């Protein structure tokens, strides 16, 4: 299984002081050496990664670059100019802390944007909710790749197997009934497996990501139809204590098959 290392949160730390440290390009070199792909989200509001970050990483790194971006003309034109290996189209809301759900596949610009990127020899992935309907739509839109949003799975795992329910970060809508949480967790894991199988049957390459960490990744790794995981925040958080290289290598060991 391949690991895409999302280095957005290195940029978050840099932007907190509006300085050039930590150096995102240095992080990209480490991710390129020890991971399989560099994933970078250039948001409309440029809250962390900047245009020059993407340009430098594409210019100087040998690894495949997976650019996450919204259906924004300015950023799509940047992608067409710089030509990352892949563009993963994601939804985006200015007020969100992180990407909260899958892409709306009924967007009028979507098909046209996919065609433009593919005509420039850029692979296109769609970041979608794990639903059979969205997988069928992705196939009809002629995307080559899908990335299943694992956020709900990750939230359920946290609620079940950590103390988050007793902290300020608890998701109250999940409730605290362990039996109910366990049933939801098992159902969501089965759903991810079903969706991954459906995507593979339709000829799509299947990735997964969002909220995956060192404690919850193993069950997802067992879904053999998923060929790639894109993981960022948990790796960067671990790197504070172990260093980025060790954090990546530890995750690589966990996702070995």
From Swiss-Prot:
EC number: 2.6.99.2
Entry GO MF terms: pyridoxine 5'-phosphate synthase activity
Keywords: Cytoplasm, Pyridoxine biosynthesis, Transferase
Chain residues that bind 1-deoxy-D-xylulose 5-phosphate: 8-9, 43, 48, 98
Annotated site (Transition state stabilizer): 147
Location of the active site: 41, 68, 210
Record-linked Pfam families: PdxJ
Superkingdom of origin organism: Bacteria
Record's keyword annotation contains Cytoplasm: yes
Gene3D superfamilies in UniProt: Aldolase class I
Family from the record: Belongs to the PNP synthase family.
Protein name: Pyridoxine 5'-phosphate synthase
Source organism: Campylobacter jejuni subsp. jejuni serotype O:6 (strain 81116 / NCTC 11828)
Lineage, highest ranks first: Bacteria, Pseudomonadati, Campylobacterota, Epsilonproteobacteria, Campylobacterales
Protein's gene: pdxJ
């Amino acid at each position: 299984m391949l690991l895409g290392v999302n280095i957005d949160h290195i940029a978050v730390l840099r932007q907190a002081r509006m300085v050039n440290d930590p150096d995102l390009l240095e992080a990209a070199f480490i991710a390129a050496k020890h991971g399989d792909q560099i994933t970078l989200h250039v948001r409309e509001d440029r809250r962390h990664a900047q245009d020059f970050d993407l340009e430098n990483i594409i210019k100087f790194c040998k690894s495949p670059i997976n650019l996450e971006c919204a259906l924004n003309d300015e950023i799509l034109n940047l992608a067409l100019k710089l030509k990352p290996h892949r563009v993963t189209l994601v939804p985006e809301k200015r007020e969100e802390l992180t990407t909260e759900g899958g892409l709306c596949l009924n967007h009028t610009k979507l098909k046209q944007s996919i065609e433009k990127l593919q005509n420039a020899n850029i692979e296109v992935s769609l970041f979608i909710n794990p639903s059979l309907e969205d997988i069928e739509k992705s196939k009809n839109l002629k995307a080559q790749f899908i990335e299943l949003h694992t956020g709900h799975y990750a939230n359920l795992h946290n609620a079940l197997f950590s103390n988050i329910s007793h902290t300020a970060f608890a998701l109250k809508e999940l409730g605290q009934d362990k039996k109910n949480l366990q049933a939801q967790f098992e159902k969501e894991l089965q759903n991810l497996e079903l969706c991954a199988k459906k995507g593979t049957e339709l000829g799509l390459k299947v990735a997964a990501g969002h909220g995956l960490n060192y404690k919850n990744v193993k069950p997802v790794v067992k879904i053999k139809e998923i060929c790639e995981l894109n993981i960022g925040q948990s790796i960067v958080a671990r790197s504070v204590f172990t260093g980025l290289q060790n954090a990546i290598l530890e995750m690589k060991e966990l996702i070995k098959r």
